[in-house]
Amino acid sequence: GVEAVSDRIVDFAKNLADGDMSKFEKLKGAIEKGFGMARKSLGGKLPDISQATYAATMKKLDAWKNGTGAKTGTEKTE
């Protein structure tokens, strides 16, 4: 569902960043671009579930950036 997919997207971004928050904007931009490409290929509008996934992903990315995000469901803990 929406939560699982958005968790995976954010976890992927976190793993790519490897703790380097200077990569945040580039990663967020790449995610936005990916959703934009999907939107374009679908005639300019994403299905409702994809719109919800985009919104959840952006919210989780912002929480990560601001240090206010809880761990995602798939995030590794040490």
What residue spans do the PLM features occupy?
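Type III/flagellar secretion export determinants
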Residues: 1-78
